[in-house]
Amino acid sequence: MSAATASRTPRAPHGVRAWMRARGFTSAVWLVLPGVVFMIAFFIYPVVYGLNLSFQGRNGGVSAYADFFTNSFPHDSGSFDSLWTTLKLALPATLICVLIAVPIAWRFRAGVRGLRVLTAVIMIPMTLGSVFVAESFNNLLGPAGWVNRLLLTLHIVRTPLEMTGNFAGVLIALVFTGLPFTFLLMLGYAAGIDASLDRAASMLGAGPLQRFWRIDFPLLLPGITITFALSFVLSFAVFPSATLLGNDAGPTRVLSKVAYVEYSNGNYANASATAMIMAVAQLIVLGVVFLIRSRLYRGSTSGGKG
């Protein structure tokens, strides 16, 4: 009896855990599961729902998209023009932020006196919020704002300068609110470049500009492209600055405003189509940026051997 029992083949484990182990799943899956559920509930489902809604226009099918590209929305006669307006705002604002952030981050990585205080000052606009910044810029740059009053008092100008209600005012606000985010990303990437590379180049007689252009800048380029991409996404979704500082009649009528107006008037298909076009436009720009990044240096930024 005991010999027969010993010769029996042990049963294969069964149950959910055994099924998961047999297919390569581990207990780490349970750690990832909340994130997957969150993504499905708050990202994938809204995107799929919005995409489906965008095909339910007045004539069904792609009529909402056709109306967008022919400027035929019932409550917005310049929807397609708003796409170019948004790009003309977001791209220059992002480029200016990157051009300002790169040299500052490069200088800060070497260490400066009061680095924490200076970094905190640069980060202040991010903590204020875009609505507060837009309202502040109205008081600062408006026809009766402090800047114009100072210029008039000093007799530098005879009439107030038009710095709000136009393209320039929105662009300035976008740069002001986007710069801290851009700087923070660039500072993190610049800090990852080994300072010994600069020291070695300096010992070989390279000056500061030579070291920057020939050593640091090529190493920074992958980080610059990522920073540009993320900053562009932030600028492309501009709404408070364009609404409070711009002119909805045309010069600064951005896509987010078009979507808001259509949604407010119950044209949900048009609003969803506008949102989908916004997403595609961003993906195209990001695709170009990442294509450029794929051709850049992707090796180590440390000065170690090997």
What are these regions (language model features)?
Residues 50-95, 264-266:
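Periplasmic/extracellular loop-to-transmembrane helix junction in inner-membrane transport proteins
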Residues 37, 44-55, 95, 99-103, ...:
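Membrane-embedded alpha-helices of multi-pass transport/permease systems
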Residues 23-27, 59-62, 67-74, 236, ...:
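Interhelical loop and adjacent transmembrane-helix boundary motif
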Residues 16-20, 92-123, 135, 139, ...:
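Transmembrane-helix boundary motif in ABC transporter permease subunits
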